[in-house]
């Protein structure tokens, strides 16, 4: 399963671990993803989405119906 937020599109980024001696080794910064069930009142069912914490805040702000219509317009099958 890919580590991508379906709402925001956040995906893993790359960077460096830097020690006190300034030695650098490559690492990945992973998004804070959660598999979360959202109740959709208009469809009278739960929808399970893999979203980041920022994605959850967007859903709280805009509403699940608006976010779902935007995702379906982008071509996501939900």
Swiss-Prot record:
Entry's Pfam families?
Answer: Ribosomal_L28 (PF00830)
One MF term from GO for this chain?
A: structural constituent of ribosome
Domain of life from the UniProt record: Bacteria
The UniProt entry's GO biological process terms, in alphabetical order, are:
translation
Gene Ontology cellular component annotations, sorted alphabetically: cytosolic large ribosomal subunit
Q: Which UniProt keywords apply?
A: Ribonucleoprotein, Ribosomal protein
Q: What family does the Swiss-Prot or TrEMBL record give for this protein?
A: Belongs to the bacterial ribosomal protein bL28 family.
Q: What name does this protein carry?
A: Large ribosomal subunit protein bL28
